């Protein structure tokens, strides 16, 4: 190769790499992250923290139930033991980078793999960053009391890929990456990444199967039958261990118990995720139309099959669930494929629109304005959590949590105030609460209560039960529900101050020796010792029973 061509090739690769790294950094900053430990992290980090033997979490009941995400928990355990908790921010940023890379793959494909034009890519990236930015979402909530941009990156039923923080659902980016790679003829790597999502989080096994079937139909229609069979076999080999783990560890303990546990999950704890009659509102309908628009734009391309098949299979199983009201099917979330197809649709539609406008864009010289916009969004994305304009937590809990973290002992077990919402009657549609002010967040009956969510991970102490964090094995779900009812009953009796001696004996029988109450609660102190009090909470220690 002539020297000048080698130099141009090297410069091209350098420019592309530099643009990619800078774009990912700006996207991660603009998208933003919630502080540790936020929302679902308090459930999904627990098994990892328990395995790492942090504090006295090995004594926590929930931390010792069957783990639905063992590989994720293993990563959490290793990271918190050998590195530092801040590594979780980096893990999430890497997955955010995969998300943006998928958008670039889609845009590059639409431009027929033409020479890299930095101005065009900068404009595409800036608009994509804007759509997904924390700043736009914050502004939407302030203007309309709803986070509307969220619905361009999330699926129906309150299900999504990225969200606010590092958690198992993030691995759905590998389904998106699989689809993106297949669209540029990387069939084997597409299959591997699609399966990787299901390996890391079994909830993606069904959606992954939809996508693999779409791959196979595409290849069959393209006359590549042997390759279609090959990727089917490869996919089966890759996901078999995960399927066996799920089947072996979450098989029914008994037919009646399994049925009852599913009923609790579907109609009591997860109705906003499980019942189409609750989540199918006008926004969800628009999201479905958004997916259909992306399919329409691909109507003259063979790639149509790759997206159409998972969409139709998800829709078909959703209709079957609605018709049969089958709880098992509801808990498989066939509509969860929308959490992949909606952001993919956004990428496709944006790529198609900008490609149509290419002649006009070339005259604009958009590089500098695009970079400036991206930098502004990145700075705002950093500012939002720093100034507590989003991802807010109940900071009035910090005092009591810090006290417990410092003063806990190995025999302690804590009873917290339990707030049990009626989600089946208060939920309609889906929403993101990441940018709600704390006052509205704590009073919105559509949101799972956020009270004391951080207790286990922050204080590293075991508690008896809470509503937010749940197990998934049927026997554990039944035990969770039993504990929840007991906690509600005890809480009512504490406030009524009825038969306190009998109540305390029941608590001692469950090995509960500490009670957290609101600051305005005064309890009879003959059998209790006040260990902590501030303007928000009190901590009571149950004295040891007197010998008869």
Kindly label every feature range from the protein language model.
Residues 24-100, 112-126, 137-171, 202-203:
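Active-site lumenal/periplasmic loops and adjacent helix-entry segments of GT-C-fold
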Residues 179-181, 189-202, 211-213, 235-237:
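Membrane-interface alpha helices of multi-pass inner-membrane proteins
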